[in-house]
Amino acid sequence: MTAQLIDGKAIAASLRQQIAQRVAERRQQGLRAPGLAVILVGTDPASQVYVSHKRKDCEEVGFLSRAYDLPAETSQADLLALIDELNEDPTIDGILVQLPLPEHLDSSLLLERIRPDKDVDGFHPYNIGRLAQRMPLLRPCTPKGIMTLLESTGADLYGMHAVVVGASNIVGRPMAMELLLAGCTVTVTHRFTKDLAGHVGQADIVVVAAGKPGLVKGEWIKEGAIVIDVGINRQEDGKLVGDVVYETALPRAGWITPVPGGVGPMTRAGLLENTLHAAEHLHK
């Protein structure tokens, strides 16, 4: 058996098309286009690439895109003032602060300053709390995108055993809550977990978001399991690889995401979906 590929690139392209159509309908109705403000502090090359992709996506779907490229030495006070200004701007539905930030800045304080109804990354404690209470409003983009990927397989998720490898605030923890909401039995593993292979081997769904290339071996995967690889690691030869050993997982899994072209495009699509949702339901 060879796993079927879950093509995140194609699914994200379809979502962008649907969003663009909805934006065009809004314009025809005399409504404004959704607006997204992206704040980039410093010159981290990976962050610059991510931000350029997000701006391109906004252009493609017809959003208003506002870019703030700030020097690395920008102060906390100046950033807070900018966020306050954007919070009150009626043309902006979403505010995104690109992480990681320079060391002198407190990312928690900055993210909490974003109004929850403009927190399109879904990281504000209010939005995480809503998800935990089974009343999601703006959902963290990567877990949201992964749920769309899982739905695309046609699998009935109710009662499935899902194992999340990695317990970060950005992916692992909200991912566990999304899977609970979908009716899965959820195990979260982390750096202190004993017998990772044993946990993975029991999983009907494995979501790996540890940031460690090749952490999960293909032979650990249960026959027919759905494998979602969130990791994106650049090797010395420039090749991008995930956290799962793809070549050995492929013959065992039922479905698997490639790296690149799996989860990454869905994270960006989730950001657009959240911004549109904010414009349509939170900022009428």
Swiss-Prot record:
Q: Does the keyword Amino-acid biosynthesis apply?
A: yes
Q: Tell whether Oxidoreductase is among the UniProt keywords.
A: yes
What's the family? Belongs to the tetrahydrofolate dehydrogenase/cyclohydrolase family.
UniProt gene name: folD1
Q: What is this protein called?
A: Bifunctional protein FolD 1
- Oligomeric state and partners? Homodimer.
Q: Name one GO cellular component term.
A: cytosol
Originating organism: Ectopseudomonas mendocina (strain ymp) (Pseudomonas mendocina)
A GO molecular-function term, please?
methenyltetrahydrofolate cyclohydrolase activity
